[in-house]
Amino acid sequence: VSDSGRCAAADPHQRGLIAREAVALLHIMKLAVGIRDIAHLRAVQQARAKADPPLRHHTRNMPRRGDEIVDGGSIYWVIAGAVMARQAVREIIADTWDDGSPCAGLVLDPVLVPVSPRLTRPFQGWRYLAAEDAPPDLAALPRGVGEAAMPADMQRALRELGLL
């Protein structure tokens, strides 16, 4: 196994000769500071990815449990006090800030997946989020839960934000 915890090419685990130990799925939760809604986050990320690909989020510290995150985990975005969306974390790399100082780069899938909103208190940095504590994707919930009781203009606004 290499220093990064990934399998080297000659590793018998990779060739399927030895059963690989299961890695627990883990997510990260992060405040999207200055972001109004999912559409705004999408626009900011698209501009950032175009200017400096690949799409990534910089963070001061390298997550110690990174292998658990890149093995199917996501970053859950807290927008206006609630967890609102998630993005798959494809890779965690050593990166640099604009001033050249070292940081970690979370390489993200460009697709933002709306989740069932969950209020949360503000916090600094990021937090680990266990898979069983993560809010479900909105698409996984039964269609129309509470939708019929909403006024048409509210439904339209929520659809525009990608929440319905």
Annotated model-derived regions:
Residues 2, 7, 15-43:
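Short, extreme N-terminal leader segments that mark the start of a protein/domain
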Residues 27, 71, 102-104:
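A generic structural signal for short beta-strands and their flanking turns/coil linkers
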Residues 41, 72, 85-89, 150, ...:
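Amphipathic alpha-helical interface surfaces
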Residues 41-48, 157:
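Residues that form generic nucleotide/phosphate-binding pockets
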Residues 46-86:
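Short, well-structured hydrophobic secondary-structure segments
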Residues 88-136:
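Aromatic- and Lys/Arg-enriched surface recognition patch
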Residues 123-164:
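Well-ordered alpha/beta subsegment
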